[in-house]
Amino acid sequence: STLSSNDAKVVDGKATPLGSFPHVKRAGDFLYVSGTSSRRPDNTIAGAELDSTS
């Protein structure tokens, strides 16, 4: 889908933003992409494991 001049979008299938920030925001000719991480849609972190023995 395309973004109009001052539109914002949260991308389906990606982790829900932790704050009130969209994944993508267009402002005129500028396109802003929010910081991304290895957080999965289920809020687990790729490559991180829980050590339950401690």
Curated annotation (Swiss-Prot):
Q: Report the catalytic activity.
A: (2Z,4E)-2-aminomuconate + H2O = (3E)-2-oxohex-3-enedioate + NH4(+)
The UniProt pH dependence field says:
Optimum pH is 6.6.
> Which Gene3D superfamilies does the entry mention?
RutC-like
Q: Does the keyword Hydrolase apply?
A: yes
Top-level EC class: hydrolase
- Which keywords accompany this UniProt record? Hydrolase
What does UniProt list as this organism's lineage?
A: Bacteria, Pseudomonadati, Pseudomonadota, Gammaproteobacteria, Pseudomonadales
Question: What's the protein name?
Answer: 2-aminomuconate deaminase
Identify a single GO molecular function assigned to this protein: 2-aminomuconate deaminase activity
Reported EC number(s) for this entry are 3.5.99.5
